[in-house]
Amino acid sequence: MSQNKRVVITGMGALSPIGNDVKTTWENALKGVNGIDKITRIDTEPYSVHLAGELKNFNIEDHIDKKEARRMDRFTQYAIVAAREAVKDAQLDINDNTADRIGVWIGSGIGGMETFEIAHKQLMDKGPRRVSPFFVPMLIPDMATGQVSIDLGAKGPNGATVTACATGTNSIGEAFKIVQRGDADAMITGGTEAPITHMAIAGFSASRALSTNDDIETACRPFQEGRDGFVMGEGAGILVIESLESAQARGANIYAEIVGYGTTGDAYHITAPAPEGEGGSRAMQAAMDDAGIEPKDVQYLNAHGTSTPVGDLNEVKAIKNTFGEAAKHLKVSSTKSMTGHLLGATGGIEAIFSALSIKDSKVAPTIHAVTPDPECDLDIVPNEAQDLDITYAMSNSLGFGGHNAVLVFKKFEA
């Protein structure tokens, strides 16, 4: 059996509520910029939810031909834009000689929800003959991967993971394993989501998952007293990851190394986490075991931290159960306090934050931290970014259905 290959991050691309590229998104995260505001994409008057993290000043026609864009749902459009940025950042040349060894693995939690709404209205109002022939290709969650591979010409391993809010992290984890075992030299991977639609807001509201707070400064406040649900966000976070051998051969810039991946199932409830965060705790331990490290080795954890009453508390319990005494010295921040919850895309964005935290020795804060929940008594990096020398960082994603996914990143050393 061949030895596992080392896997490094060489490119990044982002669309988020706090920036339309990686540079802007990261700078605003370190500044503690709040990307949450009143929803403009749809009329929210009939709903109890009125806030979300929308993209700002973004026009898809600046990136994709209008005719082509009309044949894609927004979640696919976002993936293409972020993937192009990541590949350009990595200076990855996809050509006839390399295409078979470069794959794509991008997930979406809910896929083309807006496409579904439009097609359903056409069906009800005008009959089945008026439904677009592009309806199914626009709807299905794997189409972000499909369209990105077509757009970039990547012909290697190709797939899509759907694990609700753990989608982005699971996608990167699966791509990591593909490269680690030598099935590809590089993978374009992450998550994408465009959930700010009537049906998504109505559905998540009905499940009482969303915050009904209309104050943009307090609606999303992870680990704080009075938190009442998550605030939805949209965007995409895409990485180029590749074998160290490949990266060094072409002189690529390396942000960080991926060294561990853990994924588990709660087998407990369709939306609620297992008591005491048991499933999340096992995923964190599995990721550390995969990386060959102990809790004391980790300096920073980008928490799932969605600002739900039960979810935040259970994640804190999971962290304490996993890290023990080391939890007292761990920096734990929720960047969702700034971006909102990007569902399937959140793991991609937060992998970028984790890697850049290592590279720049800075940790983005948990903003809106003014009324701490005494039961969530971790160092959540309140309100202001902090300097921190990081060797290992971890990123948690926990999804409906009991999906738990964790990645471990390491400062790169040749």
Swiss-Prot record:
<feature type="active site" description="For beta-ketoacyl synthase activity">
    <location>
        <position position="341"/>
    </location>
</feature>
<dbReference type="GO" id="GO:0005829">
    <property type="term" value="C:cytosol"/>
</dbReference>
<comment type="function">
    <text>Involved in the type II fatty acid elongation cycle. Catalyzes the elongation of a wide range of acyl-ACP by the addition of two carbons from malonyl-ACP to an acyl acceptor. Can efficiently catalyze the conversion of palmitoleoyl-ACP (cis-hexadec-9-enoyl-ACP) to cis-vaccenoyl-ACP (cis-octadec-11-enoyl-ACP), an essential step in the thermal regulation of fatty acid composition.</text>
</comment>
<dbReference type="InterPro" id="IPR018201">
    <property type="entry name" value="Ketoacyl_synth_AS"/>
</dbReference>
<comment type="pathway">
    <text>Lipid metabolism; fatty acid biosynthesis.</text>
</comment>
<protein>
    <recommendedName>
        <fullName>3-oxoacyl-[acyl-carrier-protein] synthase 2</fullName>
        <ecNumber>2.3.1.179</ecNumber>
    </recommendedName>
</protein>
<keyword id="KW-0012">Acyltransferase</keyword>
<keyword id="KW-0444">Lipid biosynthesis</keyword>
<feature type="active site" description="For beta-ketoacyl synthase activity">
    <location>
        <position position="165"/>
    </location>
</feature>
<dbReference type="Pfam" id="PF02801">
    <property type="entry name" value="Ketoacyl-synt_C"/>
</dbReference>
<feature type="domain" description="Ketosynthase family 3 (KS3)">
    <location>
        <begin position="4"/>
        <end position="411"/>
    </location>
</feature>
<dbReference type="InterPro" id="IPR017568">
    <property type="entry name" value="3-oxoacyl-ACP_synth-2"/>
</dbReference>
<dbReference type="InterPro" id="IPR000794">
    <property type="entry name" value="Beta-ketoacyl_synthase"/>
</dbReference>
<dbReference type="GO" id="GO:0006633">
    <property type="term" value="P:fatty acid biosynthetic process"/>
</dbReference>
<keyword id="KW-0275">Fatty acid biosynthesis</keyword>
<dbReference type="GO" id="GO:0004315">
    <property type="term" value="F:3-oxoacyl-[acyl-carrier-protein] synthase activity"/>
</dbReference>
<dbReference type="InterPro" id="IPR020841">
    <property type="entry name" value="PKS_Beta-ketoAc_synthase_dom"/>
</dbReference>
<feature type="active site" description="For beta-ketoacyl synthase activity">
    <location>
        <position position="304"/>
    </location>
</feature>
<dbReference type="InterPro" id="IPR014031">
    <property type="entry name" value="Ketoacyl_synth_C"/>
</dbReference>
<keyword id="KW-0276">Fatty acid metabolism</keyword>
<dbReference type="Pfam" id="PF00109">
    <property type="entry name" value="ketoacyl-synt"/>
</dbReference>
<dbReference type="InterPro" id="IPR016039">
    <property type="entry name" value="Thiolase-like"/>
</dbReference>
<dbReference type="InterPro" id="IPR014030">
    <property type="entry name" value="Ketoacyl_synth_N"/>
</dbReference>
<keyword id="KW-0808">Transferase</keyword>
<comment type="similarity">
    <text>Belongs to the thiolase-like superfamily. Beta-ketoacyl-ACP synthases family.</text>
</comment>
<keyword id="KW-0443">Lipid metabolism</keyword>
